[in-house]
Swiss-Prot record:
The modification Sulfotyrosine is found at residue 154. The active site is at residues 63, 107, 200. Ca(2+) binds at residues 75, 77, 80, 85. GO terms for molecular function: calcium ion binding; metalloendopeptidase activity; serine-type endopeptidase activity; serine-type peptidase activity. Residues 24-244 form the Peptidase S1 domain. The record marks 194 as: Required for specificity. This is Trypsin-2. Residues 1-15 form the signal peptide. GO terms for biological process: antimicrobial humoral response; collagen catabolic process; digestion; extracellular matrix disassembly; positive regulation of cell adhesion; positive regulation of cell growth; proteolysis. It comes from the Eukaryota. Disulfide bonds join 30-160, 48-64, 171-185, 196-220.
């Protein structure tokens, strides 16, 4: 299928046919501050999600790259100042050197915060994975992306979705020739529930570990078109090495 039909997930839903936006369809409003590692990437507006992995580092999708980013932590309703937020500018934004904008392979970047986040009950880091994602494992996906599979409705409050990791065979069958070893699928082959525009870069967490980053898909919540996610396990060494080199 022509790559121009891919709806990838960067949140500025300008009318580009190759649009990197991503959303939660068929989910529910997260309990307030129940996803303390979730961040909003802001450049005057929310455009992507991300995950806090240490006091001073955030991981997101490579396609979410912008030269200037403010990281917003402790958010629930992104349109209201609720008193728990921390707004910290990015000091460094480091995209994976082998990121491919055409195939979205190596769709990962790191953000160093200009000052460490204050860790508390509303803002805390998520652990990196110690094993690759296993088929059938329940996962939590979260974000402020579009909640409609057709049309647009961007929520103010953080949305959550519980969904299973699919087998690599199911993933590859859904997108023949498009799935690399650095990608995996999460969701429901029958459709109806998925991430979508605006969720890009956000977390997929299983058993308390960050297994995935919202990356791409064909449409949102479509039958036999599950969401595709960056396999964080493959990048643990790169993450650790990059942090060490930029401390």
């Amino acid at each position: 299928m022509n790559l121009l039909l891919i709806l990838t997930f960067v949140a500025a839903a300008v009318a580009a046919p190759f649009d990197d936006d991503d959303k939660i369809v068929g989910g529910y409003i997260c309990e307030e501050n129940s996803v303390p590692y979730q961040v909003s990437l802001n450049s005057g507006y929310h455009f992507c999600g991300g995950s806090l992995i240490s006091e001073q580092w955030v991981v997101s999708a490579g396609h979410c790259y912008k030269s200037r980013i403010q990281v917003r932590l402790g958010e629930h309703n992104i349109e209201v100042l609720e008193g728990n937020e921390q707004f910290i500018n990015a000091a460094k934004i480091i995209r994976h050197p082998k990121y491919n904008s055409r195939t979205l392979d190596n769709d990962i970047l790191l953000i160093k915060l200009s000052s460490p986040a204050v860790i508390n009950s509303r803002v805390s880091a998520i652990s990196l994975p110690t094993a690759p994602p296993a088929a059938g494992t329940e996962s939590l996906i979260s974000g402020w992306g579009n909640t409609l599979s057709s049309g647009a409705d961007y929520p103010d409050e953080l949305q959550c979705l519980d969904a299973p990791v699919l087998s690599q065979a199911e993933c590859e069958a859904s997108y023949p020739g498009k799935i690399t070893n650095n990608m995996f699928c999460v969701g429901f082959l029958e459709g109806g529930k998925d991430s979508c525009q605006g969720d890009s870069g956000g977390p997929v967490v299983s058993n308390g570990e960050l297994q995935g980053i919202v990356s791409w898909g064909y449409g949102c919540a479509q039958k036999n078109r599950p969401g595709v996610y960056t396999k964080v396990y493959n990048y643990v060494d790169w993450i650790k090495d990059t942090i060490a080199a930029n401390s």
